[in-house]
Curated annotation (Swiss-Prot):
PROSITE patterns referenced in this protein's UniProt entry, alphabetically: SHMT
Keyword field contains Amino-acid biosynthesis: yes
Protein name as catalogued: Serine hydroxymethyltransferase
Domain of life: Bacteria
Role summary: Catalyzes the reversible interconversion of serine and glycine with tetrahydrofolate (THF) serving as the one-carbon carrier. This reaction serves as the major source of one-carbon groups required for the biosynthesis of purines, thymidylate, methionine, and other important biomolecules. Also exhibits THF-independent aldolase activity toward beta-hydroxyamino acids, producing glycine and aldehydes, via a retro-aldol mechanism.
Entry cofactors: pyridoxal 5'-phosphate
Record: residues binding (6S)-5,6,7,8-tetrahydrofolate: 119, 123-125, 370-372
Keywords: Amino-acid biosynthesis, Cytoplasm, One-carbon metabolism, Pyridoxal phosphate, Transferase
Length: 438
């Protein structure tokens, strides 16, 4: 990165950025929600677009001088529509959580009932967790995974839905390695008169590449982040397969009287001015670049390799005696239950960090440990695949992780971690991140 000016003006911050660049280039990133953007994405995010206020939407701004940021936002919207095959998209949400908030605010009233996957079973904070707005403003009910299979039991989902009759059902996860039967979720939603929202923040890139099922034909709303498997800048997005009249009865005045607002109009108003003001135009520019990259044939090859790497790694972990929640993976991640190894997620995360491997501790279903300790770790392949690593590398990485975890109680574990760190550094230097230099 060209940071000469920053180095001269703010040496303290420059040093932090240089060290972080070194960490990213010389250690292995296996956090499932992280990835490396292209230099083009970073250039767009660091461009003069950051200087422009642009409240409103293209052609309907509250500020003047928006003709060029309008181009950027329209590019992002048009490319997202082509990428996912949707009629409506809003690229302004600052995050996936903001996107989820906008959807919930647009169709729910405080106290309404919602259903989502339990956080401790792989869900997300915004799907009804009691520590989040989604569990504080609304009456949240959680479905979970089966204790034996580790998979979602759709019969139990239907049973819960019929019992509580939610107004919104959310399908999506942050630590679930299987797919969602979105068609079955829609049947259940229709039975109880609920909206259906899919949160595809994690597998969005794999869906865009056509390798996992697209939920848009079956859901009222689809939300996502724009980073993770999409390899864009950190941000959020809301989509609808097709627009429809809002069923809440919200109207708008016309010259001849009034009409029902289309759901797109309700959603746009909920994003801005509902929960946000000025959009981050430099990030939206970066989203446009990333969506353009994802439309190229090479992105499908990348996404396919992400899945292959995860499958190879999961197979090796199973061979080494690890329990993978749900029995395997069909996407980019896996959740390792470490209870049989007598190691906590916290200990594993810290040891692997010292060995140059970054993962995150993660609760497993029916965990008896706190979220600050946990019984598992979450492992993902998006970032390592961006570096060009393949199945053979995935097997090696699983072996190195096993070497660290099985040595947790040994007196020479620190020496072993230093040795593994050197192997990891060599692996990373053989597979550099394109364009990243300290």
């Amino acid at each position: 990165m060209d940071t000469d000016i920053l180095q001269k003006q703010d040496s303290e911050l420059f040093e932090a950025i240089a060290k972080e660049t070194g960490r990213q280039t010389e250690t292995l990133e296996l956090i499932a929600s992280e990835n490396f953007t292209s230099r083009a994405v970073m250039q767009a995010c660091g461009s003069v677009m950051t200087n422009k206020y642009a409240e409103g939407y293209p052609g309907k701004r509250y500020y003047g001088g928006c003709e060029f940021v309008d181009i950027a936002e329209n590019l992002a919207r048009d490319r997202a529509k082509k990428l996912f095959g949707c009629d409506y998209v809003n690229v302004q949400p600052h995050s996936g959580s903001s996107a989820n908030m906008a959807v919930l605010f647009s169709v729910l009233k405080p106290g309404d009932r919602i259903m989502g996957l339990d956080l401790s079973h792989g869900g997300h904070l915004t799907h009804g967790s009691s520590v989040n707005f989604s569990g504080q403003m609304y009456e949240a009910h959680s479905y979970g995974v089966d204790r034996e299979t580790g998979c979602i039991d759709m019969n139990k989902v239907e049973e819960l839905a019929l019992q509580v009759r939610p107004k919104l059902i959310i399908c999506g996860a942050s630590a679930y390695s299987q797919g969602f039967d979105v068609k079955a979720f829609r049947v259940i939603a229709d039975k109880v008169g609920a909206f259906l929202m899919a949160d595809i923040a994690h597998p969005a890139g794999l869906i865009a590449a056509g390798l996992l099922g697209n939920p848009l034909p079956h859901c009222h709303f689809v939300t996502t982040t724009t980073h993770k498997t999409l390899r864009g800048p950190r941000g959020g997005m809301i989509m609808m397969g097709s627009d429809f009249e809002n069923p809440m009865g919200i109207t708008i005045k016309t010259k001849t009287g009034s009409r029902l607002k289309m759901m797109s109009e309700v959603m746009d108003a909920e994003v801005m001015p509902g929960i946000q003001g000025g959009p981050l135009m430099h990030i939206i520019a970066g989203k446009a670049v990333a969506f353009g990259e994802a439309l190229q044939p090479a992105f499908r090859d990348y996404a396919a390799q992400v899945i292959k790497n995860a499958a190879a790694m999961a197979e090796k972990f199973t061979e080494l005696g690890y329990k993978i929640v749900s029995g395997g993976t069909k996407n980019h991640l896996m959740l390792l239950d470490l209870r049989s190894k007598n190691v906590t997620g916290k200990v594993a995360e810290n040891l692997l960090h010292s060995a140059g491997i970054t993962v995150n501790k993660n609760m497993v279903p029916f965990d008896d440990k706190s979220p600050f300790v946990t019984s598992g770790i979450r492992v993902g392949t998006p970032a390592m695949t961006t570096r060009g690593m393949n199945e053979a590398d995935s097997v090696l990485i699983a072996e190195l992780i096993d070497r660290v975890i099985t040595s947790a109680e040994k007196p020479d574990v620190a020496d072993l971690c230093r040795s593994v760190r050197e192997e990891i550094k060599a692996l990373c230097l053989r597979n550099p991140i394109d364009g990243y230099t300290v």
